UniProtKB/Swiss-Prot annotation:
Transmembrane segments: none annotated. HAMAP family: UPF0235 (MF_00634). SUPFAM superfamilies: YggU-like. Belongs to the UPF0235 family. GO terms for cellular component: cytoplasm. It comes from Pseudomonas fluorescens (strain ATCC BAA-477 / NRRL B-23932 / Pf-5). This is UPF0235 protein PFL_5841. PANTHER family: UPF0235 PROTEIN C15ORF40 (PTHR13420:SF7). It holds the Pfam family DUF167.
Amino acid sequence: MSYYRWDGDDLILDCHLQPKASSDEFAGLHGERLKIRLTAPPVEGKANAHLMAFLAKAFGIPKSNVSLVSGELNRQKRVRLQAPKKLPDLPGLARPA
């Protein structure tokens, strides 16, 4: 099992979120999930909104192309990225052949 899968041109990421971190960054793997540290607190959807903006910037797409599939109130999240323009340097992440 991998932390990502392709659904056509869309990328689905399984993430483990660490809110209230000292910086916004990808932090390797946490089990079968991509660990992401964010400075935003987990209050009133702030961490979710910050996650969408962080991923949009990292993958070179507008925020409107990032959607939360599951995990709205949980650290374990599944996110859909519609047609990412670029792929950050993440463990094993590659476009399908």
